[in-house]
């Protein structure tokens, strides 16, 4: 029987600078599979209190860890964890040293945590597997579009000594929902042989879409992905397009203007990096804002915006140029239909 994801796995390994890679249906599944494998005999997993994050939908890392059957060993304080905290916690029942990237929040002030290389050296010395969960992983330098900001990439995590890295194939990678596991070949092969892996496998449609995404990165064509086009959109271009749409809608029974604003990246990532943008602001003359927003949601195609400051707002960063005409038609129709 052929391995349905063999070519994709080689592509992902190349992108991550890893010996091997594999795919499951989301990043939480990737973490659970690692936990079930590495804590099967030695049940404790060590993690800093400052990294016990809550992800979308109200799911908490601590609850995910416990649901896998692992025993959570919290160390350090919320804002301060040292290498000695990790060293003292490692014992005969330690199955895994886990580092979790705080991708959806940040701390500043009196904050400290050991460097990744230090954790990797400690894990190697103590012969404990070291896994890092990046959450919404990014494959290209975030500084290209978020000036002055660094977001850890799978390649650097592995280069600095982690045995395994997990991250999402959607979110900042821009592919379909999936979880990617990359790292040392012996660990990846063991994870693929774990009985629980079959319950987490992706279907062929997801694998195909992820393959297309990975190939664009490998062929230096990531800029053609919708997500990358949105992240790297030039402010001047957004302003020009927004003004063009505002001008085309002149005559509608509403106050329409272009206002400076910020785009939130979303996807559980980069909460402190709003991207400069402008918004198309609409205040209908004779329709309540909530009713106008509801009409747009029912339009063809549906249009989803935000109500803020007593205005209905659209950020054209997230609307591709070839979607501008359908957008304007939907807005015009929403002033007529009920």
Question: Whereabouts are the PLM-identified features?
Answer:
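Short, glycine- and charge-enriched coil/turn segments that flank and shape catalytic ligand pockets
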Residues: 125-126, 220, 250-254, 285-287, ...
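Conserved C-terminal alpha-helix-loop-beta "cap" of PLP-dependent enzymes
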Residues: 239-322, 326-327
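Conserved PLP-enzyme active-site core in the AAT-like
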Residues: 1-217, 246, 250, 330
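A common structural junction motif
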Residues: 198-199, 297-304, 332-338
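Catalytic, metal-anchored helix/loop core of enzyme active sites in primary metabolism
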Residues: 1, 310, 327-330, 334
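Short coil/turn segments at secondary-structure boundaries
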Residues: 1-2, 222-225, 308-309
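Glycine-rich phosphate/diphosphate-binding loops and the adjacent beta-loop-alpha structural elements
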Residues: 172, 232, 312
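Conserved PLP-dependent catalytic core of the aminotransferase class-I/II
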Residues: 206-207, 211-266
């Amino acid at each position: 029987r052929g391995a349905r994801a063999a070519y994709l796995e080689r592509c992902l390994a190349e992108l991550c600078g890893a010996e091997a890679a594999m795919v499951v249906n989301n990043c939480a599944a990737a973490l659970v599979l690692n936990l079930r494998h590495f804590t099967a005999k030695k049940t404790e997993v060590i993690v800093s209190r400052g990294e016990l994050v809550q992800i979308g939908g109200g799911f908490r890392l601590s609850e995910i860890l416990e649901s896998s059957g692992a025993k959570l060993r919290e160390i350090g304080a919320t804002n301060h964890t040292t290498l000695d905290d990790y060293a003292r916690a490692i014992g005969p029942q330690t199955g895994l040293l886990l580092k979790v990237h705080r991708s959806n929040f940040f701390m500043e002030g009196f904050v400290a945590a050991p460097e990744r290389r230090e954790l990797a050296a400690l894990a190697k010395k103590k012969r404990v597997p070291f896994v890092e969960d990046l959450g919404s992983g990014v494959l290209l330098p975030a500084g290209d579009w978020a000036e002055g900001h660094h977001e850890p990439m799978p390649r650097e995590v592995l280069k600095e000594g982690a045995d395994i890295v997990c991250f999402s194939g959607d979110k900042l990678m821009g592919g379909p929902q999936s979880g990617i596991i990359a790292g040392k070949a012996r660990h990846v092969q063991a994870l693929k042989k774990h009985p629980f892996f079959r319950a987490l496998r992706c279907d062929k449609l997801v694998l195909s879409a992820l393959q297309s995404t990975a190939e664009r990165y490998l062929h230096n064509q990531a800029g053609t992905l919708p997500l990358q086009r949105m992240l790297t959109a030039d402010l001047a271009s957004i302003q020009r397009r927004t003004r063009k749409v505002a001008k085309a809608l002149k005559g509608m029974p509403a106050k329409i203007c272009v206002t400076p604003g910020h785009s939130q990246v979303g996807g559980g990532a980069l909460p402190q990096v709003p991207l400069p943008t402008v918004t198309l602001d609409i205040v209908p003359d004779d329709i309540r804002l909530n009713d106008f927003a509801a009409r747009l949601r029912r339009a063809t195609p549906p249009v989803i915006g935000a109500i803020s400051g007593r205005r209905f707002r659209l950020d054209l960063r997230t609307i591709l140029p070839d979607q501008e005409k359908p957008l304007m038609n939907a807005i015009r129709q929403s002033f007529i239909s009920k």
